[in-house]
Amino acid sequence: MVKKFKNVFMIVADSMGIGKDQKQESFGDNGANTFLHVWQNYDLQIPNLKKLGIEALVSLKDKNEDLKPQAYVGKIFAKSNAKDTLAGHWEMMGIQTKVANPNFIEKGFPDELIKELEKAFDGRKIIGNENASGTEILKRLAHREIENNEIIVYTSPDSTLQICGHEEHMGLENLYRYAKAARQICSSKSIWNVARVIARPYVGQNGSYTRTFNRHDYANKPSETLLNSLQKAKIQTIAVGKINDIFVGQAIDKVYPPASDVENMDVAIEIAKTKKENQFVFVNLVEFDSHYGHRRDVIGYGKNIDSFDKKLGELLEVLSDDDLLIITADHGNDPTFPGSSHTREALPLIVYSKAFKNPSYLKTLLGLGTSGNIVARNFGLKTIETGEDIWDKLK
């Protein structure tokens, strides 16, 4: 058994799936493999991920048994009956999603819900109400929202209700107010209870519009998670990126709001440099999913992996023997796959510390809570039921 670490960093490469899992066919995603298909279409430059052992999980070449990974690496199969951000992150912290939240991709949101939303949106007429790409719907409808004081509402293959608002014409505060009201309305009936209401601010004019990083997610409030246990044990919980929104601020001590993946990695690097103790740093890198997976931009996805690998190298340099790093993912989103939605896939688990003596390949593991259990055991807490306990294998 390895020693206890003073700090644990968990980085979620949002949507970085690694191929088939036990439920892939039932989700209609047979053949999806996000990382492999990106690698087949883009010449990845990833010396740090290779050093840690990514090629044991997915590679263009036959597995090389002579590879000596510097981290423990394994594949995880999710337990939850879902393939979305909320289900993935919640499972990491101890909550299994057995029944997926409703989605509205076939017919849009029902008239009764639309009427309730329009009342809450100061009488603005809702336009859109369809399954759409966020960037595409702005091209079609943003001018109407601005000129007529209407409001774009749309959904995605995930369980979401997304609301657009121009930062100048509508104003961020109004957009956030509408999104909070929509969360309350959706939560009032089980048939409307989407996993997330998302405020999608944008800027621009004359047909040229860009979404900004002032996005906010309003999720259902989870029951108590491992984060609560950490907080009660006086371990500082630090949320970087979307993490605070995903857990509705519950049991989060310090928040670094969503930014680019590079900027979120920079936050992790700066935290590591402080050499403080008793910290759990939970990082989400959303651009893999939002900018490249959903948009089916395989080259962009590859470039983002390269950028992540470069920042990963900087992080590895500043981590000490007293730090533990976990890299994983919440679901897949294969940019070569038909459609624009998430893909059900196996997910990576990479566990690294300079203190490890002889890291090795792990067997396939059941439950994203496996990563959470590493955190729990490190800080002397009770394990969670949504994953396996591999702590005693880390040496």
From Swiss-Prot:
GO biological process: 2-deoxyribose 1-phosphate catabolic process; 5-phosphoribose 1-diphosphate biosynthetic process; metabolic compound salvage; nucleotide metabolic process
Name of the featured protein: Phosphopentomutase
Catalytic activity: 2-deoxy-alpha-D-ribose 1-phosphate = 2-deoxy-D-ribose 5-phosphate; alpha-D-ribose 1-phosphate = D-ribose 5-phosphate
InterPro entries, per the entry: Alkaline_phosphatase_core_sf, DeoB, Metalloenzyme, Phosphopentomutase_DeoB_cap_sf
CDD domains the UniProt entry points to: PPM
Principal place of residence: cytoplasm
UniProt superkingdom: Bacteria
Record keywords, A-Z: Cytoplasm, Isomerase, Manganese, Metal-binding
Cofactor note: Binds 2 manganese ions.
GO cellular component, one term: cytosol
Taxonomic lineage from the root: Bacteria, Bacillati, Mycoplasmatota, Mycoplasmoidales, Metamycoplasmataceae
Organism whose genome encodes this protein: Mycoplasmopsis pulmonis (strain UAB CTIP) (Mycoplasma pulmonis)
Gene that this polypeptide is encoded by: deoB
